[in-house]
């Protein structure tokens, strides 16, 4: 359980202090659940004329469960207009994890699975794969409105999911469609390199300090022995050092290898 002070600093206090919404057949609760659903679905404003009145009616009459209601919303034209048509595929998958399972993707294999699923079976199969999953059933069941779970320790949750949740959650009042980076995926590099993401606070994107794999500001000292360039005899080879940023470390090592140089040591600068 996260302390109220930490929750306030990290920007998710409203979620930490609010119990999950369990839907029952009353108009007041349906209205509250509808607000929470679209708060989870990107926190984007839904006009009265855009509301899915037929789905609401089915829910209020008890003909469908909350899970079916969420399915109808996620497969609706409204959801597609907000998060699918103008959004890159990987970013769309990130948002589906956030909206429908309440967490961020853990690793690249989850992204690859959903890319292949959409390519082979289409949009509806992609949405159904989250809602029909065992994870959804265990977390929300038939009557609980999906909510953000990535801020708390959950059974079977990977620790890295906590950090990654803050990459795709940018504050309580933020909308997924208003984020400046909405036109590209947020986690591509960290997932591809299997790195833990920095925790970004909602205020001005300030990163919290600490030992985090993949710190983009870290410099490394690379010591190499130069190639002999075809000489048959050599008494001594000189050792050269390079100061390289984290982002340039891999390309630099590739270039040195192509030149025939031998890396003898890599250490933080």
Curated annotation (Swiss-Prot):
It holds the Pfam family PBS_linker_poly. Its main location: membrane. Residues 217-269 form the CpcD-like domain. One of its GO terms (cellular component) is plasma membrane-derived thylakoid membrane. InterPro entries: CpcD-like_dom, PBS_linker_dom, PBS_linker_sf, Phycobilisome. SMART domains: CpcD. It comes from the Bacteria. It is a peripheral membrane protein. Rod linker protein, associated with phycocyanin. Linker polypeptides determine the state of aggregation and the location of the disk-shaped phycobiliprotein units within the phycobilisome and modulate their spectroscopic properties in order to mediate a directed and optimal energy transfer. Belongs to the phycobilisome linker protein family. This is Phycobilisome 37.5 kDa linker polypeptide, phycocyanin-associated, rod. The lineage of its organism: Bacteria, Bacillati, Cyanobacteriota, Cyanophyceae, Nostocales.
């Amino acid at each position: 359980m996260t302390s109220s002070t930490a929750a306030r600093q990290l920007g998710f206090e409203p979620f930490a202090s609010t119990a999950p919404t369990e839907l029952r057949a009353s108009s007041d609760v349906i209205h509250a659940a509808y607000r929470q659903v679209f708060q989870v679905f990107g926190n984007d404003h839904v006009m009265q004329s855009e509301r899915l009145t037929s789905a609401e009616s089915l829910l209020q009459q008890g003909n469908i469960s909350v899970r079916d209601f969420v399915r109808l919303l996620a497969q609706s034209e409204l959801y597609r207009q907000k998060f699918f048509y103008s959004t890159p595929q990987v970013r769309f998958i990130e948002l589906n994890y956030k909206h429908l399972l309440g967490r961020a993707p853990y690793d690249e294999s989850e992204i690859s699975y959903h890319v292949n699923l959409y390519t082979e079976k289409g949009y509806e199969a992609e949405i159904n794969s989250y809602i029909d999953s065992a994870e959804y059933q265990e977390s929300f069941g038939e009557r609980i409105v999906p909510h953000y779970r990535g801020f708390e320790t959950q059974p079977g949750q990977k620790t890295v999911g906590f950090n990654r949740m803050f990459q795709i959650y940018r504050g309580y009042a933020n909308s997924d469609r208003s984020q400046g980076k909405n036109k590209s995926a947020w986690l591509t590099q960290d997932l591809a390199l299997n790195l833990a993401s920095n925790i970004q606070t909602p205020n001005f994107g300030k990163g919290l300090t600490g030992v985090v794999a993949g710190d983009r500001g870290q410099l490394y000292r690379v010591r190499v022995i130069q190639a002999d360039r075809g000489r048959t005899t050599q008494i001594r080879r000189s050792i050269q050092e390079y100061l390289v940023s984290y982002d340039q470390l891999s390309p630099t090592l590739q270039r040195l290898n192509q030149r025939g140089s031998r890396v003898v040591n890599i250490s933080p600068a």
